Amino acid sequence: SLYAPSAMVFSVAQGDDVAAPTVVRATTVSCAPGARGTHPDPKAACAALKSTGGAFDRLLSEPNPDRACPMHYAPVTVSAVGVWEGRRVAWDHTFANSCTMAATLDGNAVF
């Protein structure tokens, strides 16, 4: 193939135990040669991933300062597992709660 494989599974799970998550939702995306998968907008997800240059921490942004989140701990973990541009990827990030997750992923097309 002329394209390096890019096939990922993205999940949002309750809790902070990556080894045994309680998955709330999961989607798949394959970006080469065309965007497809179970993700609601695979084209936008592929564009967001491509913009990271493979550094998935770049999916995170400074939390929106106009959004106030409660200070309770109900951890939510997002993860990306699969192959991105020919390299195996296993990335995750845990947030204090779903509000903090939404504020930090503000406008992100992946999760």
Curated annotation (Swiss-Prot):
It is found in: Secreted. The keyword Nucleotide-binding does not apply. The keyword Nucleus does not apply. It comes from the Bacteria. Keywords: Disulfide bond, Protease inhibitor, Secreted, Serine protease inhibitor. Its main location: secreted. Pfam families: SSI. Disulfide bonds join 31-46, 69-99. The record marks 71-72 as: Reactive bond. GO terms for cellular component: extracellular region. One of its GO terms (molecular function) is serine-type endopeptidase inhibitor activity. HAMAP family: SSI (MF_00778). Belongs to the protease inhibitor I16 (SSI) family. Homodimer. Inhibitor of subtilisin and chymotrypsin. This is Subtilisin inhibitor-like protein 8. It comes from Streptomyces virginiae (Streptomyces cinnamonensis). The lineage of its organism: Bacteria, Bacillati, Actinomycetota, Actinomycetes, Kitasatosporales. The gene is sil8.
